[in-house]
């Protein structure tokens, strides 16, 4: 018995798109910096911390292993156009940049995702970010800043 499978392939035009990876918080640099350090320390090993320049980088984070690597990486990044690729491992290195703008602080997160391709190149290949992880982290920072306002008694008054 012969089965014929047909289908179509959709090619993205104009390259990969990503969610925004920066956000301005209505809080001073010192407050935002403290939240950044606490938040990053909760899930990653900090490699570099430079408060003067507002920069924090992480050691590589494991993003999936074995057969699950490709599935997990696809949640956060765009798969490279490597048709025969098989992915045995994934990782991400994050950089956080905080910049004071008067009474506000802008935080920009850069995520570099890579997958280890074990069929053709046998090397680590870049997976362009979708901005998903960065947005989750920016939301966590916003929530932490909001929680600190309520703890300090500066939040909105409820009547």
Residue spans for each PLM region:
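Ser/Thr-rich, low-complexity intrinsically disordered terminal regions
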Residues: 9-159
